[in-house]
Amino acid sequence: LSRRIDLGTGLVCLGVALGLAAGCDYSRDRVGDVPSGTYRPGMVAPPGSSRTQAQPVAARDSTEKAAILASSIELIQRAALQPGGDNFGLATQKLNQFFEGTPQADYQLDSAARAFLQPQLPPVKLSELETTVWSLRDARHLEDCMMYYGIASRVGGTGDDLVRARRVFDWIVRQIQLVPPGSLGSPQLPQVPARPYDVLLRGMATESEGFWAERSWLFMALCRQLGVDVGLVTYSRGNVVEPLVGRAGRGERGGGGLSAMAKQPKPDIVWLCAALAGGQAYLFDARIGLPIPGPDGQGVATLNQALADPAILERMNLPGQSPYGTSRASLLASPSRIGILMDSSQGFLSPRMKLLQRDLAGKNRTILYRDPSQQRDHFARVLGDRCGEVKLWSIPLYVETELFRNAQFVQSSLQTLRLFSPEFPLIVARIKHLRGDLSGAIQEYVSFRLAENLPLVNDKKKTIPKEIQDGLDIYATNYLALAQLERNSHVQAESMFLRLLELLPQPGSNPHRYNMLRWGAQANLGRIYEAKGDMRRAIAYYGQLDPTMQYHGNLLRARDLVWQEPMAAAPDPLPPAPKVPPGR
């Protein structure tokens, strides 16, 4: 069906860069490692346990079970706002207590899901999906999904699936800016892919051809909470014919023989996101921050429309400036037809999460599980004859695995979240922001922005170093603008974004990663001025250089505005970036 996902250190070239030591905020739990006191007589024995027969246990009544589950959820929700305790360990213990005595058969994959997953996952991963023991990774999955559900339901609002998915996509593009591959790394530690939760915290993602698709993964995760299946669309450009002499010249066995003429399949090209709604696959390109416009530039194009009408993708080209790269012809000529990569996050595949999801209701309602074979069938049904291989996307499972076993991968992840350490006030404000408490978040941002001699959160006798405070000031300014933008307070958002541009030199002129926030501020100012009808200023901000693929989307927006008034005067030049940060 498909190649098995390789979770070894060689996956996708990252293993070459990853290696040695360091601490770890992510707990390195193994299946079967849970806090002491978790097991009680009657529980199903964990894998490898010497106990072969469960002992009877008095069943908990529904009131006691409800209290246990509520306590577990409360511990997880408090963890981010009150860091430093053992909330996840205690929550995991309570999950084991809540499900003790559950029949082992309830933890098993059904036959269709197993048939889909078995060729793609190592046996140890299949075993982990079916374990009866709840682990710290499960508690993390619950935390992630509660965050995603809160955002998706708040932003998506009411309406049909497409309307809600469009709102979520637009929110992501405004709130999560793009940065170039490698820009969040350091000489000591490379940039590594980030899970959606971490992307939300830092407000930065990387999208590039092929490997980097962090904003796309976030779109998948949020749409999952809307009940909308989203996958990455792939296609191929044909095969490569190896020259007769090439292999022999490199000293390879068999060089010059007929095998040297064998055609080698090219790797699939990862294109954009397809969201399934109303029996159609709608196209959203997180790389450029735009849905593909439908016929005559209206609505969102479906895959069927893009395959039928060459003008739809031709409209995405910017001749002489920025080619789009994918055309109707390249899609129709794909030897592998149209493939789909599905989210491989382990939690969404595990029957444990299906059990837990059934017990979540009301304010705790969260989507934790999606049957992988049913999702595969959904894509196959919608794509029809054009459907190629529908399989798991390897990156999500790889990231989750490395975060729990590879110390250097963890350090690479944490270096992008330094200012979100529990010792600084930014993390609490940002969590409130993402949970929709915009008033509370704004109050928190204001309380430490531009503060002097601010003490550490966890040690009032020590003050925050100036370099850290400068970074907190920048992030607070950016997030104040984004919070006001979410409140539709465009005047306040404009003021904060303009102030941010006054503070930040061009990225690259000094080592601070937060200087890249200039690019997001410029794009958002373009959106604000477009909404106000100030098209000349909107065009000016859309035209500002941005080294990511978002620049292509910004130029498309600018082009559409120019076409509305082709004889209008050129925009006035914008103020230059400061050479050095002015005093804050």
Regions found by a protein language model. Name each.
Residues 505-518, 547-561:
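Boundary/linker segments of alpha-helical solenoid repeat arrays
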Residues 145, 149, 153-158, 164-174, ...:
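Hydrophobic/aromatic-rich core segments of domains that either
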Residues 25-28:
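Bacterial signal peptide processing site
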Residues 67, 71-207, 211, 265, ...:
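Secondary-structure boundary elements
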Residues 501-502, 533-553:
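TPR/TPR-like (Sel1-like) alpha-helical repeat modules
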